[in-house]
Design a protein with these regions (language model features):
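An N-terminally biased module of ancient metal coordination in phosphate/nucleic-acid-related enzymes
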Residues: 1-94, 101-103, 221-236, 240, ...
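Hydrophobic residues within beta-strands of alpha/beta enzymes
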Residues: 39-41, 109, 212, 252
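Extended substrate/RNA-proximal surfaces in nucleic-acid metabolism proteins
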Residues: 53-247
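Generic long, charged, amphipathic alpha-helical segments
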Residues: 246, 250-257
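Extended hydrophobic/aromatic segments used for targeting, binding, or gating
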Residues: 254, 262-287, 295, 299-304
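Alpha-helical oligomerization segments
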Residues: 303-315
Length: 322
């Protein structure tokens, strides 16, 4: 099937967008060239009515995101142009970053559950990471007794998750006790299922077309690690999770940026197994590039062969993208 829509991408209004050319007008022009019929823009936003936004989200509130309306060109080039949003599910506190009532201002909502690089916000630090930070805090306090407890804590938390994970794995301070890949796999299953049970999410999904962004894709890891983590999740567990989404009428996103192994007709791509199980569970699908650049929109073509391999046809697409 040739994919003729893309409803997951980020313009310069998203803080993570790195391409100054990634404007709504430029996106629409390129998507017409790609042969799309439906195009939706989904910048990262957090509802200011919901407490608990991370520092990264605090400057990306609803009023800010709605400025996109003024950026859309009058000539949509025959495209069905949608104003969407990618909000957040902070699984560590079971907090959905958008109220259902607020979501009605958008044509659709994408909800990720696997931003596993957002530690202690989306995914809790594991016991080893906490133990390492405690060692740092103890040594900083001993070396610099003039610092307050809060200042010591800030210094101990200075290193990001990639450094912390690497130091733990090295065994320089202690022998690791947590299988990190299994931990992440289990946490993603936990976060997906808790999202499906979240009362605000259930209301939101009933109010606005909703799709789970890059499901079970552990963000922030190298591609070989990502593949191993996904492959740790058993078929029956994925089928159960996708059945919960299907029961709520929640779509599943095929995120072309997450398709990291296109060789030999995606023979080693873990998303093939995953999406076949979503199809078996009766889920509908949306496709998105998750592009943060103008050039990234072209990756939608990965979806053509991928949909054929999985068996996704027009009849399996969510209504919003038809």
């Amino acid at each position: 099937m040739r994919i003729t829509h893309d409803i997951h991408n980020h313009t310069t209004l998203s803080r993570c967008c790195y391409d100054p050319r990634a404007t709504a007008a430029a996106f629409i022009e390129r998507t017409e060239e790609l042969g799309h019929t439906v195009f939706g823009i989904s910048n990262h936003l957090w509802d200011e009515k919901v407490p608990g936004a991370s520092a990264w989200y605090k400057n990306q509130m609803i009023s800010y995101g709605l400025q996109l309306r003024d950026c859309l060109p009058r000539d949509s080039r025959g495209l069905k142009v949608l104003l969407g949003v990618e909000t957040e599910y902070a699984a560590a506190s079971d907090t959905l970053g958008m109220l259902a009532e607020t979501a009605k201002q958008f044509d659709y909502v994408l909800v990720p559950h696997s931003h596993t690089h957002m530690r202690d916000f989306v995914m809790e630090d594991n016991a080893d990471a906490r133990a390492l930070r405690a060692i740092f805090a103890e040594r900083i306090a001993a070396a610099l007794p003039e610092l307050s407890a809060e200042q010591v804590k800030k210094m101990a938390n200075t290193l990001g998750y990639t450094d912390i994970d690497a130091i733990v794995a090295s065994g320089r301070f202690f022998e690791p006790t947590v299988d990190m890949e299994k931990y992440v796999a289990d946490k993603m299953v936990e976060s997906f299922n808790s999202l499906m049970a979240n009362s605000e999410f259930i209301k939101l999904a009933a109010a606005v077309p909703t799709s789970v962004a890059h499901p079970f894709m552990p963000c922030g890891f190298q591609k070989e690690v990502q593949r191993r983590i996904i492959n740790l999740i058993p078929d029956e567990v994925l089928l159960d999770s996708f059945s919960r989404a299907s029961a709520l009428g929640v779509a599943i996103e095929v995120n072309t940026a997450s398709l990291r192994f296109p060789e030999d007709d995606y023979a080693e791509e873990p998303h093939v197994r995953m999406m076949k199980l979503a199809l078996k569970a009766g889920c509908r699908f949306t496709f998105g590039t998750d592009s943060h650049s103008l050039a990234g929109l072209d990756s939608i073509r990965k979806g053509d062969d991928f949909s054929r391999v999985v068996g996704i046809g027009e009849e399996n697409l969510a209504d919003i993208v038809r």
